[in-house]
Amino acid sequence: MLIKINQYFRKSISVLGNLKLAIILLLMLALFSAFGTVIEQNQNVAFYENSYPNSAPLFGFLSANAILFLGLNNIYQTWWFTTLILLLAVSLFSCTLARQIPSLKMARLWQFYTKDQSLKKIGLSFNLQKTSLSKLAFTLKTDDYNVIQKGRFLYAYKGLPGKIGPIIVHASLIIILFGALLGNLSGFVSQELVPLGGVFHIQNIINSGTLSYVPQNFEGYVKDFKIAYNDEGSIDQFYSDLSILNSTGEEVRSKTIYVNEPLRYEGIVFYQTDWSITNLAINVDQQTNIQLPLKSINVKGEGKFWIASLPIANVEKATNDNILLVLEDLTGKILLYSSNQQLLAIVNVGENISLNGHSVKVTDIISSTGLQIKSDPGIPFVYIGFFLLMLSITLSYFSYSQVWAIKDNKTLYVSGRTNRAIYSFEQQITKMMNKLNSTYA
């Protein structure tokens, strides 16, 4: 029974470790990843129905129904994409067990040839008449070869790290795949729009894995938000002073974040991604304080604007006039328009203006910062995998070279081979043999 199980295991390892299977799996992952790049991910159903109408499928087959049925709207979290990653990892592991590790073990064995006819079949062969086996061994040792001499036979090798390289390549790829899979299953992405002075929890989740956990034992606090402008008046950078508070309200981490400079806390990364203006604080007749909500409008070719409507009583007409307040940025300049879109005035924050006999002053512009909050436990594994991959590339430059020799009467038969840089190896060995002949003549 155990023999049959062992045979089945070896056969399975042989099939899964097939190079063609690994290449097919890798190409499939690359193809579906390309689909994930082309097809917008994690959008609502209406988006796909509008972008990929069922009545007119793209390329004749890519419709909203097909995308949703196959999970192409969320490729990286589908069961079949996860299965492909697992199969590729198993294939690489099987190849390592079936081919790379046995190859390394063979490289460490002492492989003596006992007949000069066998040496001649290797390819690069020499017959030396004027030197001894011990002199050859000394010369090889000075060239960093590991030399084993047994009677009139000699075996030497160097460049064993070159045999370790392929194993590290497979190990690094498996670690990278594990990191990607871990991130898909247990990571999450949240987007929060938080007003200045606001406190927030992670709640607006836009993407999460089946095993993801969103911690609620801390909260964020936006202490300040500001925008830096360049000389042309366009936005150069925007900054948020962000604090992390524990369950007792104590600050445990703080940092001024900006684009490409996030805050990190317990494996969660807070990125600065956007900003907006949410409210205007207004004082009327030095008595009434109100907050007007702002609506953002994108005008093609002109940029983004924020608009609020302020109803002001018109005593003469016994009606309310709607005054439109328009902002382009956080510089404090506010444009006031009548309901029929006539420009009434341009004021700054803190400046009084008379509207229909009422004293109106904008006391503050309340801005919001846009944060992307991301957790990806697989990232450290991906970094480790890529580091090992770079290390394996370095190791691959080591040529694994072997030299055999047999002393038969007065003739020393020498042969050698290498797995790469063959021309350079042939030059080195030929030079070595010529030196032996001339030195010990």
Curated annotation (Swiss-Prot):
Cellular component annotations (GO), alphabetically ordered: chloroplast thylakoid membrane
Positions of transmembrane segments: 19-39, 78-98, 164-184
Membrane topology: Multi-pass membrane protein
Pfam family of the protein (one): ResB
Compartments, record wording: Plastid, Chloroplast thylakoid membrane
Keywords: Chloroplast, Cytochrome c-type biogenesis, Membrane, Plastid, Thylakoid, Transmembrane, Transmembrane helix
Superkingdom, natural source: Eukaryota
Major location category of this protein: plastid
GO terms under biological process: cytochrome complex assembly
Family: Belongs to the Ccs1/CcsB family.
Role: Required during biogenesis of c-type cytochromes (cytochrome c6 and cytochrome f) at the step of heme attachment.
The protein's assembly and partners: May interact with CcsA.
Protein name: Cytochrome c biogenesis protein Ccs1
